[in-house]
Amino acid sequence: AAGSDIVIVTSGVARRPGQTRIELAKTNVAIMKSIAPQVAKHAPNALCIIVANPVDVLTYAFLKYSGMKENQVIGSGTLLDTVRLTYKLSQELGIAQRSIKGYVFGEHGDTSFIPWSMVTVEGIKLDEYTKGARRLGIDANDFDPDEVITYVRKSGGEIIKRKGATFYGVANSVVDVCEALMGAQDLVTVVSSMMHGEYGVDDV
């Protein structure tokens, strides 16, 4: 609607079973090219959250085609991947998901990666936690990091295969972002945004 404070962009062709996010890019970039100028025209001061896939590509496309400021446009990025990471680890370790802090970086989907050195359990490095738990006789299952990253990367495809779409997980994640943007929730998380030299990356 005209004058909106937040615009959530979900427009795009749905991902088919077996289809990669990159295969969606050509069609969905064209859709973004058509709607981005209209959003800029009717809600020029809005904060825009891009959810459509491939989200990182489309966030960049929306920013370029809309002409809006970089601090007005973000994508859902690896937010959902991060939730899947903490969920999987909670199952492997037998502890509450809220006790685990960690992030998934990179592109949303099959090329994402986990910086394991940043994963903690109540502030304790993950490897230190598992070693300490075993010393104390606490059940801390050994887990295969490769299995965890496979779960994180492939969960979306499995959900699409079984249910046809991934509505609820991403919707819940975007609600958290909206609440943070409106000041209703203090949240530190991962999103897609324009880079200018951070981590040695520029104009991405």
Residue ranges of predicted features:
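An anion/phosphate-binding loop that grips the pyrophosphate of nucleotide cofactors and donors
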Residues: 4-5
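Conserved NAD(P)H cofactor-binding loop of Rossmann-fold oxidoreductase domains
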Residues: 11-13
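Helix N-cap/beta-alpha junction loops of NAD(P)-dependent oxidoreductase domains
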Residues: 16-17
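Rossmann-like NAD(P)(H) cofactor-binding subdomain of soluble oxidoreductases
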Residues: 20-87
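C-terminal substrate-binding/catalytic lobe of Rossmann-fold NAD(P)-dependent dehydrogenases
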Residues: 66-72, 82-204
